[in-house]
Design a protein with these regions (language model features):
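Non-DNA-binding regulatory cores of transcription-related proteins
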Residues: 71-156, 162-164
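N-terminal intrinsically disordered, low-complexity, charge/repeat-rich segments that act as generic
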Residues: 1-70
């Protein structure tokens, strides 16, 4: 079974392809009907949008190919990895912080998700409960104690998990 991010990217790709193949041709045809294309702002806007969409479609196709090699079965069940919810304690302040490790496309700081390629994300990868990790952040070195790890496999489907 593929990762949830792959399914979301495929939906986004389908939306962009629909706009590129159905909506934009109609907008371009309508703009052409207005006459001189050299001074036609509608036509220029549609052509610009077409270029942007083509680039986005290519980027999404590449990312889907890259991520499609991973399956849920490859995600560890016993340590921090993609999709894990990790509670850490800041060694300096004693503050408890929960992070969810995700791919860069899924980052939502307001929801507590961080990229697996961020300094903290990289430091937490493959850690288990009880581990101590020191990471270099833009604000300096930080040490965290891993309090709990809930892997992607242990989470309800609506909260990032999928049955494997």
């Amino acid at each position: 079974m593929s990762l949830p991010i792959v399914e979301r990217l495929k939906l986004e790709l389908a939306e962009k392809q629909r706009e590129l193949q159905q909506d934009l041709p109609a907008r371009l045809e309508e703009a052409r009907a207005h006459g001189d294309l050299r001074e036609n702002a509608e036509y220029e806007a549609a052509k610009n949008r077409q270029g942007i969409l083509r680039a986005q479609v290519a980027q999404l196709q590449t990312r889907i190919r890259e991520l499609s090699v991973y399956t849920l079965a490859q995600i560890p069940r016993d340590r921090v990895s993609y999709g894990s919810r990790v509670t850490v304690e800041d060694a300096d302040s004693g503050e408890s912080i929960e992070y969810r490790l995700v791919f860069p496309e899924e980052v939502d700081a307001s929801a507590g998700s961080i990229s697996i390629s961020s300094p903290i994300g990289q430091g937490l990868m493959n850690r288990t409960e009880g581990d101590e990790v020191t990471v270099q952040t833009p604000r300096g070195r930080k040490t965290y104690h891993v309090i709990s790890v809930v892997t992607l496999h242990e989470q309800p489907e609506g909260q990032g998990g999928k049955s494997a």
